């Protein structure tokens, strides 16, 4: 039985939440393997919008959901989200949610440092959400992190927090010139959360591998997008974790040979939140139209998303980096009514045309997109249930995406709800 990884191919906000919610109906387990609560997944069920930031989207389908070792977790946010989902009538018992004992915890000092650092950068800021994700990953890399396993030993937890906060407070006071934090208060706060958290803590790697050996189907849910990847994204305007499909194995504790398919989610146009290069960004009425019709506001920050034409240089890059075996096209209906639709097929920079992503951020910032133009369609496609019922120009647009990317389209989404989805090939079946 197949195990499927779902990743974003752009800069996040591609509609992964809806697709994971849809595919979760066929999976037994759903796993989040990287990132933190700097990402938000939005699901619309029976007209009701539900947003999750840490708990995998599969919780809506009453599946067993795992938060892997590659995720950094703010325990306060996690418990707030569990309470929110519970208030919506969703089963959030420890039988449904498992947190890796090896996942790192976002501590109060991580958030203080994150916000102070961004403030100090001024105009050079990169647009972090200020939720402590980056500083937590820093501590993980330098072997100073606090993991969920540390909550099992109260004395050890207190000792580790006291030691690390001596350094963090020195940093806050002497470099950022901002308020310090009381170690005793932090320890007391987390010990107050301990009893609620302990039932959820699990060896996720063991549980997942055991389930796979028993034939359980697993869906791995990525956060953000390929071009926010710490290794392959538009560095330094990236997130602090690896967002590509290969990290599904490392970030959850399974072998890469157990990943069967990789589905790349691509919005029918391109958006980005925060700072960073964006070659196809539109500053005209079409960009405004995409933003308004697509309701392009971040689920986590509420920030207005920048909008532009579909960028095939990005998509081909994502296909290569992730080894995509299928594409999911989302928000296709947002393009309804446009007379002309453009696709970026390359970048031009000082007389040179790039058909691959340039590594130098300065080059990317100075690139001019090379476009090909396609006729749009006037019809409303949001109610269409069968691919063959699409207008001819819609089908030609989709065919061109498939041709340029070299990846087959498996699913097309024409609205926020589950029902507004056309499945061409269900890999779980």
UniProtKB/Swiss-Prot annotation:
Its main location: cytoplasm. Coiled coil: none annotated. It is an enzyme of class 6 (ligase). One of its GO terms (molecular function) is magnesium ion binding. It comes from the Bacteria. Pathway: Purine metabolism; AMP biosynthesis via de novo pathway; AMP from IMP: step 1/2. IMP binds at residues 13-16, 38-41, 129, 143, 224, 239, 303. GTP binds at residues 12-18, 40-42, 305, 331-333, 413-415. Homodimer. Plays an important role in the de novo pathway of purine nucleotide biosynthesis. Catalyzes the first committed step in the biosynthesis of AMP from IMP. Belongs to the adenylosuccinate synthetase family. This is Adenylosuccinate synthetase. It comes from Desulforapulum autotrophicum (strain ATCC 43914 / DSM 3382 / VKM B-1955 / HRM2) (Desulfobacterium autotrophicum).
